[in-house]
């Protein structure tokens, strides 16, 4: 097993993230202000402000492996994705986005928790064209306009290896042995999530990703 530091790509302070919304990890939007505590005006986020964007490079290798073989990649949650002291309220509102090899047509957006904060710490206050979003919608920016779409995020468990349950239902990436792949990592607060309220202010998390690789057609790590 090898470790590598995640290199931050954007210049946003990783110590202070603000609510944004996205459906594709390409276009993010924010609400610069509210009206009667409702987010009704939106603008495109410029220069990757308000969220974290980092990058690492991955290569599958192993003794006796050949370049014709393929390794399926999964997340390994044995060490937990965001450190052992992260507050659950932050996880409920956060999203982890992954883009492999620059292919933005296949973004992976993960929910880091399937729990919800107490009702007095939740709020649906995003309004688009006079309609309030429900808890399963996010904002899409296209051709200068903002619309509400279904939240594309999925549970992190769909891609995470669990020793007691075996391989997950989905594969992050099928990697050719020896080939180097880039991985762009996005960590942000989904502003349309009902859990994204003042209750998550001043909470911190350490972003650490572990991966589990299995040769295609085999069950070995």
Model-predicted segments: where are they?
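Short, polar/proline-rich extracytoplasmic segments that appear immediately after membrane translocation
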Residues: 1-25, 203-221
